[in-house]
Amino acid sequence: MHKLLLIITVFSTFNVAQASLTSIVASVNDKPITFNEFHARKKMIMVLNNVENLTSDQDKQLSDLAINSLIDESLLFQYAGDREIQQDEIDNAIKSIEDRNKMPHGSLLQYLKNKSVNPESFIFQIKSELIKMNILSSLSRSVQVSNKEIDVAILSSDQKDVEILMQVFRSKDGSNKAFTKMNYLKNRLKKCSDVKKTLYDKFATMQLITSKLSKLGGVKQTIVKDLIPDKASNVFEVNNKFEIILVCSKKILNVTVDENNYVVNFLTNKKISQKAQKIFKNMRKKAAITIMFPS
């Protein structure tokens, strides 16, 4: 009997040791992520997405999603350092989620509890999202959008007509020599205001044209649309002669203040997102991350 108890004790000790080894599923810069945190996050994701039964492949995907969300969360908390997320920020975030889902205020956490989800896992995720929003907010102060970027974005939408002022250079003949000279001219065209007649008058003519983009012929419309002011096109052939277009100015027509503001906000958010992604990518790249849970 004494031997049997000893064997049971040995096996019990072995199981406890195994449990302690598997209680940590990952570490981020020596900060542990426990199995309980991992399990709670999986459960939370399942409940919030109304998922009940999983195939083995789906369970693996869910495990990857849960562990990666916890790793990102840990990195964000470490990035924030001593900066505390205030309780009223958390409460307002939860109320916002409840409003979007048409839930009474104060019911979301209780709903999670009723589904056997640890509310702390949800609150930690809320905190990490608030840290992320603070990062985005700080980035917004360093982002600027130029008029040129706004014009390019509006032009690319093909929803507005554009008034074009351009210089069109046309060779006097279609010889190889004329083609060579036109290429040489193209490389010297920098700004409309700097163009002198002596640059081209021996082998080409120049016509100053004002036109709406929509009124230009197919080939010219395509070429001009892609050109920015004071940028010369490549040499192209028209009716056995060679042409170059140098755009002097572009004026987008009939853009309202609201439309302009929409484009500015879109471009600003895009730049902020790109900067944020770079920060988050660098967080991961520089971190010492170890995953001990089978992926």
UniProtKB/Swiss-Prot annotation:
Entry superkingdom: Bacteria
Keywords: Signal
Transmembrane segments: none
Signal sequence residues: 1-19
Matches recorded under Gene3D superfamilies: Porin chaperone SurA, peptide-binding domain (1.10.4030.10)
Annotated protein name in UniProt: Uncharacterized protein RT0667
